[in-house]
Amino acid sequence: MNTGSSACSIDWKKVKGAILTEHGVKLPADITGEKLLELCHADRPGRIYPILPFLEYAKNGGEPQVNAVGYGASEYNGLSAQTDTFTLKKFDEVLNAQLLKCANKGWDVYFWNQDNMLIGYNDDTDILAGIPMSTVYPTVTQYPTSSAKSAMTVSFSHEDVEDSQLHFDYVQLDFNPKNFVKGLVDVVFQKLEAENTYKIVEVVGGYDRTEEFGSLIADGAADVMNNVTSATYSDGIITIVPKAGAVPSLKAPSVLYEKGIRGIEQVA
């Protein structure tokens, strides 16, 4: 054991966001903002899932368990389970539904703070890993009250909090992740009454995104859509020329990303 402190003492600032990855999936050592955005659109299991912004933090658990046996001396017996809870800016109905859907799933999680420190887990390799979490889940107040707006928190339960602390590590970034990361939203390629006409609509709430992406999709139709030879865009409607007998659909987000179509994924 040694009790010295780092020659570069850190004044730890507030955590501002998190990045979820599948267990064992790491951010690359030479990470850049552009690479983070690309990874948000990557094919699974290599995709990353950002959650932000965090406004407040509360710790639950993670306390030393010290007990005596009979009249013997007190002895350390580990740390109690710990959950880190962060308050978001507002209730987000889409994020809430997605987190609930995956609440029984474990993740590796990176955090970043105000000083752009990327916080993670030292797994004895040259590349920082995410902190293993047994579950990540939301808690919401969906509707405003007389004294407060609707609200949402996201909680991260450590798989082994003592192990998390023993292997705590970080790297300094030269950019702010919040300026680059972008979580994806589920959309449908919705068929309209007129033949071969479509819109891009968000699954939850039905918000129409066609105006935002219509021209890009039409310009690269054969590259960004399955079973389509060409397309045009006009007045909020995408008109396609489909391949015979085939159902048109958007390609994977990794393909859309290369054509400048970002932040969406078509679901069945």
List PLM regions with ranges.
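Solvent-exposed edge beta-strands and adjacent loop segments
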Residues: M1-T83, A129-S147
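Short, acidic/charged, Gly/Pro-enriched secondary-structure junctions
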Residues: K89-L128
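Extended Gly/Ser/Thr-rich low-complexity repeat segments
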Residues: L99-Y110, Q172-P177, V247-G260
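Beta-strand-rich domain onsets/edges
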Residues: L173-T197
